[in-house]
């Protein structure tokens, strides 16, 4: 099984173990921000234990910047951004894609960017503007953008292959 597939499974399972995962807790270190940090920390601990040399955490995407990917798997040329607020109309969707394009431009072998969001992220990111950005990233930069939605009770993956590509 590819590392990314296994890692996505771990991310989904970790979310299902947190009873308040689907709730909107609000901003703040003791609320939503703290819950997100706890979730990311758990995922990172499992990844570090399972793949100490294959999965890079907080990977510097663009040299001489503070632009990092949450996770990067060099052998699969894939980055993962845990962007739980993707379901909000204003999120880091465009910024994360632009970061990936800058990383490619700087020479990072990157063919796939996976964005992890909470429930309703898939619906929001299937709106015309988001689809246009995804298609442009593929057509102009051969960068496949995927949005995966996780929820405590279930998981849904966006059926969104890049144009002309089938799994």
Describe every region a protein language model picked out.
Residues 1-58:
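Acidic-basic catalytic patches of nuclease active cores, encompassing PD-(D/E)XK
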Residues 34, 38, 64-66, 91-99:
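Short, well-structured alpha-helical interface segments that form or flank functional binding sites
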Residues 41-75, 88-91:
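Active-site metal-binding core of divalent-cation-utilizing nuclease and nuclease-like domains
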Residues 71-86, 100:
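Conserved catalytic cores of phosphodiester-cleaving nucleases, focusing on short active-site segments
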Residues 77-79, 107-119, 145:
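Hydrophobic beta-strand segments of well-ordered beta-sheets in folded domains
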Residues 81-97, 123-127:
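Active-site-adjacent loop/helix micro-motif of nuclease/hydrolase catalytic cores
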Residues 91-113:
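Short, charged, amphipathic alpha-helix that recurs within catalytic cores of restriction-modification
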Residues 115-167:
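Domain-level recognition of nuclease-like catalytic cores that cleave nucleotide substrates
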């Amino acid at each position: 099984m590819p590392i990314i597939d296994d890692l996505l499974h771990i991310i989904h399972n970790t979310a299902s173990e947190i009873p308040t995962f689907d709730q909107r807790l609000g901003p703040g270190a003791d609320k939503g921000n703290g819950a997100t940090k706890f979730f990311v920390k758990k995922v990172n601990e499992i990844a570090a234990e399972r793949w100490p040399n294959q999965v890079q955490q907080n990977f510097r995407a663009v040299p001489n910047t503070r632009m990092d990917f949450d996770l990067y798997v060099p052998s699969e040329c894939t980055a993962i951004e845990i962007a739980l607020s993707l379901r909000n109309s204003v999120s880091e969707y465009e910024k994360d894609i632009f970061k990936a394009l800058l990383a490619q431009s700087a020479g990072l072998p990157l063919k796939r960017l996976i964005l992890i969001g909470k429930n309703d992220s898939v619906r929001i990111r299937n709106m015309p503007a988001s689809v246009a950005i995804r298609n442009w990233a593929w057509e102009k930069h051969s960068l496949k953008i995927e949005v995966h939605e996780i929820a405590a009770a279930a998981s849904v993956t966006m059926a969104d292959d890049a144009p002309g590509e089938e799994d």
